[in-house]
Amino acid sequence: MAKLILVTGLAILLNVQLGSSYQLMCYYTSWAKDRPIEGSFKPGNIDPCLCTHLIYAFAGMQNNEITYTHEQDLRDYEALNGLKDKNTELKTLLAIGGWKFGPAPFSAMVSTPQNRQIFIQSVIRFLRQYNFDGLNLDWQYPGSRGSPPKDKHLFSVLVKEMRKAFEEESVEKDIPRLLLTSTGAGIIDVIKSGYKIPELSQSLDYIQVMTYDLHDPKDGYTGENSPLYKSPYDIGKSADLNVDSIISYWKDHGAASEKLIVGFPAYGHTFILSDPSKTGIGAPTISTGPPGKYTDESGLLAYYEVCTFLNEGATEVWDAPQEVPYAYQGNEWVGYDNVRSFKLKAQWLKDNNLGGAVVWPLDMDDFSGSFCHQRHFPLTSTLKGDLNIHSASCKGPY
């Protein structure tokens, strides 16, 4: 019995010392600080012990060089990277791109070797100047949305050249190499058009897969934002609109499992029902739901706004085939994630030997704990616990 206790104690000690093999990456969006008071979220609100990587969204591009979007971003950079004083194991990445940024600046930049080198060298200078540990390329998307087919190849060329430049800079200056990651699409047709997966997997440190935004009001019927599995009603291409199918596609087409980071949304998509008596998956809809009080975006509610919707009397339903919830009240309907679905997805992630999770975005979790009455950052904290994320040197505020 004494030997068993000793062995168990050593195992626990080793686990604490070695830490988790999983990554927990968290996006911070620069516009979160501009929300009304209770929803305003600044870099100083971030628990430095919560995530392994913090990703600042977004930088811009001018004349093929990376640049900040607003002058306030520079103060944010300092505050975000200052969190590393409290957690020496924390890494910070700067994301460039995003949906609103569009593909055009990327297409122009990758079009010639000279433009690519201008961009790559500007990235190295910029990241070092502002104390970031790496880059997140968020090109949405190579080969889609007006980006020409040749960009599929040129994106791989860019990534390969950037990785080489990062390695050379590291050797030349005898400093840790900058990390290189990319956001990856979650729609199969977009993946096919945009990515040479084996080549990207070889050059990138991680691929953060957008396993969310899989259904929205443009569909004309209700659907989950980020279902783990397909619905019995999913046929044709709809059968691929789930986390399991998307990640399987990336793996089956050449991505290393340990480099795949699964997207976890801290928000839901909202719909207006055509008929309030029809509330299930696939029910007909007429438009996006009204904007949330704090996020102020039609068709979307932050997790903490979903909690308010539930607290005000909405009916919550567990969608068992897809392992995620939805809720409705009157003619309003929302598909989202909660602590239960995050736990199930975290276990699935571990069962599939994947690299970790990425939360989009941290500022839509219930960071204050005052809306959902669970705890601070209930969704992200669930992932931290279930993926065994910890830093022995970090002392957080919660």
Swiss-Prot record:
Residues 22-390 form the GH18 domain. It catalyses: Hydrolysis of terminal non-reducing N-acetyl-D-hexosamine residues in N-acetyl-beta-D-hexosaminides. Chitin binds at H70, E71, G97, G98, W99, K100, Y141, M210, T211, Y212, D213, W360. InterPro entries: Chitinase_II/V-like_cat (IPR011583), Chitinase_insertion_sf (IPR029070), Glyco_hydro18_cat (IPR001223), Glycoside_hydrolase_SF (IPR017853), Glycosyl_Hydrlase_18 (IPR050314). It is an enzyme of class 3 (hydrolase). Residues 1-21 form the signal peptide. One of its GO terms (cellular component) is rough endoplasmic reticulum lumen. Induction: Up-regulated in response to IL3 and IL4, during the inflammatory response and upon parasitic infection. Its EC number is 3.2.1.52. It is found in: Secreted; Rough endoplasmic reticulum lumen; Nucleus envelope; Cytoplasm. Pfam families: Glyco_hydro_18 (PF00704). GO terms for biological process: inflammatory response; polysaccharide catabolic process; response to nematode; response to selenium ion. Expressed in peritoneal cavity macrophages and in peritoneal and bone marrow-derived neutrophils. Abundantly expressed in bone marrow, with moderate levels detected in gastric antrum, spleen and in alveolar macrophages in lung. Not detected in brain, heart, liver, kidney, stomach, intestine, skeletal muscle, ovary, testis, thymus and lymph nodes (at protein level). Detected at low levels in bone marrow, spleen, thymus and lung. Barely detectable in intestine, kidney and coecum. GO terms for molecular function: beta-N-acetylhexosaminidase activity; carbohydrate binding; chitin binding. Disulfide bonds join C26-C51, C49-C394, C307-C372. Keywords: Carbohydrate metabolism, Chitin-binding, Cytoplasm, Disulfide bond, Endoplasmic reticulum, Glycosidase, Hydrolase, Inflammatory response, Lectin, Nucleus, Polysaccharide degradation, Secreted, Signal. PROSITE patterns: GH18_2 (PS51910). Lectin that binds saccharides with a free amino group, such as glucosamine or galactosamine. Binding to oligomeric saccharides is much stronger than binding to mono- or disaccharides. Also binds chitin and heparin. Has weak hexosaminidase activity but no chitinase activity. Has chemotactic activity for T-lymphocytes, bone marrow cells and eosinophils. May play a role in inflammation and allergy. Belongs to the glycosyl hydrolase 18 family. Chitinase class II subfamily. This is Chitinase-like protein 3. The gene is Chil3.
